[in-house]
C-alpha cells in the first residue's frame, strides 16, 4: 500500500498527500492559508467530516467555508453543545437530552424541575458567548456502545442512557463523541474546529416540549437560540424576527376582525365578517379559475361509514387522525344493520372515487376533474394546534383528476400553469420538492416504482429545479410539494400534486379504452392553495394585513371632513357599492385626521376624503394605504381606478 493518497478537488485537479494527513493540514499545505482560515468543515467522498479528520484513502475533497449556509448550520449545532455545557455548569443537576440545529437556529431540551426565567436566559446567553471566546477545540472520538452506556450511566444522564440503548438495539457497535473542555456529548457530527469559530449567539425563548414528542412522557424545557458568524447578520436576523412578530397572523387576524378561536371548539376558527369576505374572495377566485379550466365542482357528505375508509386504506393508516362520531358496532341493543361506525371525512378523495364509479367511463371523457371546497376534519393533537397554520377543521381547494397514464405529464404541466397564475397574483415565489414512498404505505414496490418514475418525469418536464424529500410521500403515492416564499423570505408548504395508482385498484375504478376493454385510470390528487386556513395565515403575514385592493375585505372607506358633507359621502359610497366594490362610509363626529388614521390602522387600500371641493366636483380625494395622496378626481374616474386595481387577477 502506497504511503500517498490522491485527493481530487472540486475542479477535477488532483494532489497527493501522505496517508493520514488531517484535512486542515492538507488544505494549509496544498491549497493555501486563505481557504484554511475560511474552512469550517469538509466532505470526503460526499461525507461531512471535521477538518481534523485524517485522509486515509484516495478521495474527493470539498471544503465548506463560513460563506456557506451549511457551515452556519454546523456552527449552530456547535452553539447548542456550548449552551448545554453552560446550562449544566450554571444549574447543576440539569439533565440534557437532545440539541439539534434547526432552520435559522438551534435548540436544546433540558430536564429541570425549576423553570428557566428570562433572567436565567440572559445569564445563559452571556456565559455561552464567554465560553465561545475561550476557543476550546471540538475533539471527536469513537467508543464502544458498552463504554458509552457506562459513561453516561456514570454521569447520571438518564435521557442519554435511553438514547444509547435505542441506538445499540438497532445494531450499532460504536458511538461518536464530541468533547469541548470537560463537557461531552454524542452526535454524528461534523463540528467546527473550535468554539471560537462559532461567532455570536443569541438565545430567543424557552418553551415546553415533551420528551420524544409524546405527551405521555416528561415535559422538558426547550431553549431556542440562534448563531451567526457576524454580529451584523445577527442584528439583521433579529430585526426580521421583530417584523415576523408584528406580522403574526395570530395577532393581526383578531385585530383586523378576520377570525378568532374559542375554547369550546379548539382548532376550529370562527370566521368574522371581514374574514368571511376574505375567505369568500379567495374561494370565488379559485372557483372561477378551475371551472374555466375543465374542472367540475362537486360536494359530498361530511360523515361516512367506516367501510369507506377501510376500502380507501385510511382506516388502517390514518385512523388516529380521524374523528370517530358514531361507534355502535358492539352495541347489542341495536339491530345488526344499525351497528356501525361513522367518522367525519379527513380527506375528499374517497368520496370523489365513489362519484367517478357511478358511471361507466370512456377514454374519450378523460381527464375527469372533480373540484370541491368541502370542510374536512383531522384530529390533530391539541399541543400541535397553532393559529390557522395547524387546525382541526379546514377546507381545501381540493381536486381529483382521473386520467390515462399517458396523460399524466400534460396534466401536471396544466396544474403548474394554474399554480403560476395563482402564486404570481400574490407575489409569492415558489420551489418544488419531490417526495417518495414512506415506510407506511399501500401498494407493492413495482407500483411505487412506476408511480415515482412517472411523477419524476412530469416534474422534470416543468423545467423547475426541485429537491428530493425521500420517504415523505403520501401512503398511497408519491407527491410534488410546492414551497412558496413570502415577502420575508420564509418558505411555506402549500400546493401538492400526488399520483395514485392504488385507489383505482381499491375502488375498482375503470374506463373503457380504444380497444373496447376496461382499464384502470390513474388518479392525481391536487390542491393549489392547500388549506384555505393556512393560506390565509400566509397571506396575512406576507402582506402584514395590508391586502391588495382586490383581496381586501373593505376596499375603500369614504371619510367626511365634517357632517355637512355626509349626503355626498353616502351617495358616493352607495354608487361604488352598486358597482360591486366593498365600500364603507365613516361620517362619524371624529376629526378628519382621526378618521384617516383609523382607516390606515384598518389597512384599507383606499381612504376617500369628501369635503367641499369634492362635493362641488362630484368626486373624491383618494389616499392609498401607506400615505400616498392622489389628486381629487370625479367619482367615475375613481371607479375606473378600482376596475384597474381591485379586479381579481384570476
UniProtKB/Swiss-Prot annotation:
Gene coding for it: thrS
GO terms for MF: ATP binding; metal ion binding; threonine-tRNA ligase activity; tRNA binding
Residues that hold Zn(2+) according to the record: 349, 400, 525
Catalyzed reactions: tRNA(Thr) + L-threonine + ATP = L-threonyl-tRNA(Thr) + AMP + diphosphate + H(+)
Region spans: Catalytic: 248-548
Cofactor binding note from Swiss-Prot or TrEMBL: Binds 1 zinc ion per subunit.
Broadest EC class assigned to this enzyme: ligase
Assembly mode: Homodimer.
GO terms under biological process: threonyl-tRNA aminoacylation
PANTHER family referenced in this protein's UniProt entry, alphabetically: THREONINE--TRNA LIGASE, CHLOROPLASTIC_MITOCHONDRIAL 2, THREONINE-TRNA LIGASE
EC numbers: 6.1.1.3
Keyword Zinc: yes
Pfam families: HGTP_anticodon, TGS, tRNA-synt_2b, tRNA_SAD
Taxonomic lineage from the root: Bacteria, Pseudomonadati, Myxococcota, Myxococcia, Myxococcales
UniProt xrefs under NCBIfam families: thrS
UniProt protein name: Threonine--tRNA ligase
Subcellular location(s) per record: Cytoplasm
Gene3D superfamilies linked: 3.10.20.30, 3.30.54.20, Anticodon-binding domain, Bira Bifunctional Protein, Domain 2, Threonyl-trna Synthetase, Chain A, domain 2
A GO-annotated cellular component: cytoplasm
